[in-house]
Each structure stands twice: as structure tokens, then as C-alpha cells.
Amino acid sequence: TILHHIPENRIKDVIYFNPDDLAHPIGMNLLELPPGLEGDDLLREKDIITESTISVLRKIFSEDDSGGHRIEYVLRNTIQTALTIEGATLFTIFKLLNDSKYRREVTKTLKDEDLKNFWKNEIGKAGDFQRVKMAAGITAKIGRFLFSASAKKILEQEKSTINFDDVLDSGK
């Protein structure tokens, strides 16, 4: 393996990531909020996480996806809603879009008026067919991860087990 070619003095700097190791998956939660944030700092971090997640998922969406801007609008509001839930993961987005009972429970607790209006007016007033169509572009992309055993093990964890800022800052 490649590990045999790493100089001994650098072995502690190596992070071995094997997505097929289902017994010891690295956790990577794209929606994880740092603990202890409040007020404007929390709002700013939620915006950063929302835009970063959209950026990652945009790479999966093809440029010719019809309704790409509409998909991003729905995705942005869904991520912002997910970020109001303790321990939200990428799969929370899927659940919000596809599980009406769960969505009703979550939206009842929302304090943000814009998010309340989105779920009430955009999603709530849409017919079943329209609602499915709005969610389809997003759920098809996230569904790729839901049905991959290795991706699911990595992305469904509430706490990330690797800190990429630390990895980059420490020269690993």
C-alpha cells in the first residue's frame, strides 16, 4: 500500500481516508455548526455553511439542469431550516423535503419569519405534484449519497471526526 512509501518521520502527518472502510468511517457533516456561537456570529456561520453546501452540491448539479435557480432557492431555504435543528446532516435536507409529517413538526418551531413564509407559501400552497417537482432536483442529487453505503456512513454523522482547517493549518 501507499503507507509503506511514507517516510517514518512524516507518518504522524498522514491522514488515511478510506471511504470503503465501513467499520471505521470518517465523519463529515457539512451542516455542523461550531459550538458556542450566538447572535450575529451564529447567523454568519449559518450563511457560510449554507453557501458552502450549495457550492458543493452545485458541482453535482449539471449546468443544464432546468430550474437551477429555483433548485438553489429551495435548497437554500431547506438548509437554513435544517440548521435550526440540533445535529442536522445532509440527510435532514432530504427528510425535510420528502417527509411531510417531519416537515410540519420542524416548521412549527421556526422563529425566522422568512423561513416560515417559505414553508407556508412556497411549499405549503404547492400541490403534491408541484412539491415533488420542486424537491426532485435536490433529492435526486442528495439521494446519490443516501443509497451509497460508504457515503452514508461518512455523511450521516452529526459530528465531523476530521477538522479540515486543522489539517491545513498543521501542514498534514
Predicted regions and their residues:
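P-loop NTPase motor domains
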Residues: 1-172
